[in-house]
Amino acid sequence: MPLSNNVIGCINFITVLLSIPVIGAGIWLAIGTVNSCVKLLQWPVIILGVLILLVGLAGFIGGFWRITWLLVVYLIAMLILIVLLGCLVGFIYMVTIRGSGHPEPSRAYLEYSLQDFSGWLRRRVQRSYKWERIRTCLSTTTICPELNQRYTLAQDFFNAHLDPIQSGCCKPPTKCGFTFVNPTYWISPIDMSADMDCLNWSNDQNTLCYTCDSCKAGLLANIKVDWLKADIFLLLALIGLIIVYIIGCCAFRNAETEDIFRKYKQGYT
């Protein structure tokens, strides 16, 4: 027995609801303190979510008001969007699967290396003109200054579980051998390492280690964590859309619009 138009409309309305986590994931990535300084996939995710919302509304309207051509547009467009969302979910996973912190002796926080991350992510921060914009944005946040309010003793700081970006941007790398004064002010050793990150460190609060590769690595580590969280929501939305799409195809075939297929067959008999 064919499904009623109301049931078809309700099934397609679920598609509208499933667009919410996609749009929400994009907005969440866009408004985060770190992600707001790096414009990567936030807008593609939001745009894809909005398209899913609009196509879902088209299917909802087509189902309730028996607008056959609108249902056909819905099925074709939704298939394309499902494929695009699947590619996006896979892409995010592939570019974030690499990259993790390295422990240092007598430190609770981790150190990060730029070379540990995927080439695609590295290219987003290695170009000087891109990093200058990101660096300027990061230097205006409270990511580093808040550490001075939180930790006054060296041992408390060394036992702290810092965010990757705080570990990479707000202090010199541990291997440089600097002496702690406060989280963002360090005394350099007499025989300082020739490592570029050690040379790039500055006690100027607007500079710190924002030009260091460790800062770029810390930024990517933060992005990786946020993107993997967003990817979970996108994956759940993808699974839901696939299920709804399959049900929608069956409903379209068995509903009252089956007379279109009957006329199509009669044309060949």
Swiss-Prot record:
Taxonomic path: Eukaryota, Viridiplantae, Streptophyta, Embryophyta, Tracheophyta
Highest rank taxon of the organism: Eukaryota
Segments on the Extracellular side according to the record's topology features: 32-44, 93-231
Residue ranges crossing the lipid bilayer per the database entry: 11-31, 45-65, 72-92, 232-252
Membrane topology: Multi-pass membrane protein
Keyword vocabulary terms for this entry: Auxin signaling pathway, Developmental protein, Glycoprotein, Membrane, Transmembrane, Transmembrane helix
Pfam family, one: Tetraspanin
Primary residence: membrane
Miscellaneous comment as given in the Swiss-Prot or TrEMBL entry: 'Ekeko' is derived from Inca language (quechua) for small and hunchbacked fortune god.
Tissue specificity: Expressed in seedlings, roots, leaves, stems, apex, siliques and flowers. Present in ovules, prominently in nucellus and integuments.
Name by which UniProt lists this protein: Protein TORNADO 2
Cytoplasmic compartment spans: 1-10, 66-71, 253-269
Family to which the UniProt record says this protein belongs: Belongs to the tetraspanin (TM4SF) family.
Keyword Transmembrane: yes
PANTHER family according to UniProt: TETRASPANIN-8-RELATED
Record bears the keyword Transmembrane helix: yes
Glycan attachment sites: 200
Cell compartments where the protein resides: Membrane
